[in-house]
Design a protein with these regions (language model features):
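Bacterial N-terminal signal peptides that target proteins for export
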Residues: 2-11
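Bacterial N-terminal signal peptides
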Residues: 10-20
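Sec/Tat signal peptide C-region and signal peptidase I cleavage site
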Residues: 21-25
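Noncatalytic scaffold domains of N-terminal-nucleophile
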Residues: 26-60, 72-73, 77-237, 242-244, ...
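Long, structured ligand/cofactor-binding scaffold of large enzymes
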Residues: 64-66
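Short, intrinsically disordered, charge-balanced linker/junction segments flanking boundaries
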Residues: 306-308
Length: 308
């Protein structure tokens, strides 16, 4: 049996608990920016539910969903979509990921929605003419993109384990993209460092994240009208809009125009997969984590076994 004291020590356990939010819970901690000179630890306690993410605005979206009666999966999916707006460095519709879910009845499951290589991918596509690795091809070119899994994964989780409709949990992200939000330290720092190196070669992205010839700065307002439209279409028409509809057509056209490999067929064929988590015993606690293709879950269990 998993001991409650252990689950409370794991940051993500609150999102996997399936509990509803209690009005008696403590207010969210002040936002802490990463990528700066100093971080401050803000302990927070709650009796029924808790939300944690890399971005305070996205975290608040999840808290609001819990307050409105949503469960942990509803909140997690809403936060994921919000991060596609507020944390474009990593959380976005064009990526993928993994999700562990522990339901109220005690079952634990894993959802794999990592990106997949396009059908036309080859083992040497990131090599230059001399056969040497070319980091630009593997990191910043259109070849670096895999078939996205985010939208499919969120939909699978929400349909099977959530309680709210898709348009409800996408709505906060849509509003953030449409109305804009204030750029924080983390995004400003990343735009200054990486945006100056990468974005000048991608005019569509530069048009969003640059203003008056330079990357957006802390305090600027970031509005993403095209992303808002995409989110609205997904909310109204479901994941098929992304994988088989207008958005899929635009992705395929962009790839073909710029040397990428993702096709409409790749997008239409993508499926998120539910898997059985790996598990291990550590000092009497049952630890669950992601199975392959994630490597981290296996390593965690191995390391804990070594420590024991």
């Amino acid at each position: 049996m998993i001991k409650p004291t252990f689950l409370r020590r794991v940051a993500i356990a609150a999102l996997l608990s399936g509990s509803c939010f209690s009005a008696a819970a403590a207010p969210p901690a002040p936002p802490v920016s990463y990528g700066v000179e100093e971080d401050v630890f803000h302990p927070v306690r709650a009796k029924q539910g808790m939300v944690a993410s890399v971005d305070a605005t996205a975290t608040q979206v999840g808290v609001d969903i819990l307050k409105e009666g949503g469960n942990a999966v509803d909140a997690a999916v809403a936060v994921g979509y919000a991060l596609a707006v507020t944390h474009p460095q990593a959380g976005n519709l064009g990526g993928g990921g993994f999700m562990l879910i522990r339901s109220k009845n005690g079952n634990t499951t894993a959802i794999d929605f990592r990106e997949m290589a396009p059908a036309k991918a080859t083992r040497d596509m990131f090599l230059d003419d001399q056969g040497n690795p070319d980091s630009k091809k593997s990191l910043t070119s259109h070849l670096a993109s895999g078939t996205p899994g985010t939208v499919a994964g969120f939909s699978l989780a929400l349909d099977k384990y959530g309680t709210m409709p898709l348009n409800k949990v996408v709505q906060p992200a849509f509003k953030l993209a449409r109305d804009g939000f204030i750029v924080n330290d983390a995004l400003a720092d990343d735009l200054k460092t990486y945006g100056s190196e990468v974005l000048p070669n991608h005019e569509n992205s530069k048009a969003i994240f640059w203003k008056e010839g330079e990357p957006l700065k802390k305090g600027d307002t970031l509005v993403q009208a095209n992303l808002a439209k995409s989110l609205e279409m997904i909310a109204e028409n479901g994941p098929d809009e992304f994988y088989k509809g207008t958005i899929a057509e635009q992705i395929a056209q962009e790839m073909q125009k710029n040397g990428g490999l993702i096709t409409k067929e790749d997008l239409a064929a993508y499926k998120a997969v539910e898997r059985t988590p790996i598990s291990g015993d550590y000092r009497g606690y049952q630890v669950y984590s992601m199975p392959p293709p994630s490597s981290g879950g296996i390593h965690i269990v191995q390391i804990l076994n070594i420590l024991e």
